[in-house]
C-alpha cells in the first residue's frame, strides 16, 4: 500500500472529520485522480517531438500516456483535424499516491526559486490545477537525454465540495502552499 494512502486513512481523515464535523467518514473528501497533461504544439512541424514528449511523460507517471489530437483544423496554428497536439495520462489509486508523494517530497523542492505553490488555483469545485515549467524537476528525467524543456499541467481532482475543503485536504498531505 502506498505511504500516502496509509497516511490519508490514519491521519488526514480523522483531522478533516474534526475540522469540518462530518457525520460519516464517507463524507470526507479524498483525491480521486491526478491528470498530467503536456501540450506539444511543436509536434505539428516535427513528429519526433511527440515521441520524446510521450516518453518523458511515461517516465514521470510510470504509465503510458494517451496522445491527444486536434478536434478541428485551425489554419492560423497550422494544425489539421486529428493532428497529434499533446499527450495526457490519468493516475488513480496507488500510482496516484506514489506520484503525489514524489511530487511533494522530491520534485517541487527541486524547482528553482521555489516558495510554494499558489493557493488560488482551485476551480470552485474542489479541484486543483498547477503548471510545471520544466520536466527536469522529476528525478526520472535525465537532463542529458532530453531534447527540449517542456512544461506540463497537473490537475488534482478531489471529491471536495468547496475549495476550502480541498485546500484543507491538500494541506494535510503537506502540499507546499504559499504563505
Curated annotation (Swiss-Prot):
<dbReference type="InterPro" id="IPR020930">
    <property type="entry name" value="Ribosomal_uL5_bac-type"/>
</dbReference>
<comment type="similarity">
    <text>Belongs to the universal ribosomal protein uL5 family.</text>
</comment>
<dbReference type="InterPro" id="IPR020929">
    <property type="entry name" value="Ribosomal_uL5_CS"/>
</dbReference>
<dbReference type="GO" id="GO:0022625">
    <property type="term" value="C:cytosolic large ribosomal subunit"/>
</dbReference>
<keyword id="KW-0694">RNA-binding</keyword>
<keyword id="KW-0699">rRNA-binding</keyword>
<dbReference type="InterPro" id="IPR002132">
    <property type="entry name" value="Ribosomal_uL5"/>
</dbReference>
<dbReference type="GO" id="GO:0003735">
    <property type="term" value="F:structural constituent of ribosome"/>
</dbReference>
<dbReference type="GO" id="GO:0006412">
    <property type="term" value="P:translation"/>
</dbReference>
<dbReference type="InterPro" id="IPR031310">
    <property type="entry name" value="Ribosomal_uL5_N"/>
</dbReference>
<dbReference type="GO" id="GO:0000049">
    <property type="term" value="F:tRNA binding"/>
</dbReference>
<keyword id="KW-0687">Ribonucleoprotein</keyword>
<protein>
    <recommendedName>
        <fullName>Large ribosomal subunit protein uL5</fullName>
    </recommendedName>
</protein>
<dbReference type="Pfam" id="PF00673">
    <property type="entry name" value="Ribosomal_L5_C"/>
</dbReference>
<dbReference type="Pfam" id="PF00281">
    <property type="entry name" value="Ribosomal_L5"/>
</dbReference>
<dbReference type="GO" id="GO:0019843">
    <property type="term" value="F:rRNA binding"/>
</dbReference>
<dbReference type="GO" id="GO:0003723">
    <property type="term" value="F:RNA binding"/>
</dbReference>
<dbReference type="InterPro" id="IPR022803">
    <property type="entry name" value="Ribosomal_uL5_dom_sf"/>
</dbReference>
<keyword id="KW-0820">tRNA-binding</keyword>
<comment type="function">
    <text>This is one of the proteins that bind and probably mediate the attachment of the 5S RNA into the large ribosomal subunit, where it forms part of the central protuberance. In the 70S ribosome it contacts protein S13 of the 30S subunit (bridge B1b), connecting the 2 subunits; this bridge is implicated in subunit movement. Contacts the P site tRNA; the 5S rRNA and some of its associated proteins might help stabilize positioning of ribosome-bound tRNAs.</text>
</comment>
<dbReference type="InterPro" id="IPR031309">
    <property type="entry name" value="Ribosomal_uL5_C"/>
</dbReference>
<keyword id="KW-0689">Ribosomal protein</keyword>
<comment type="subunit">
    <text>Part of the 50S ribosomal subunit; part of the 5S rRNA/L5/L18/L25 subcomplex. Contacts the 5S rRNA and the P site tRNA. Forms a bridge to the 30S subunit in the 70S ribosome.</text>
</comment>
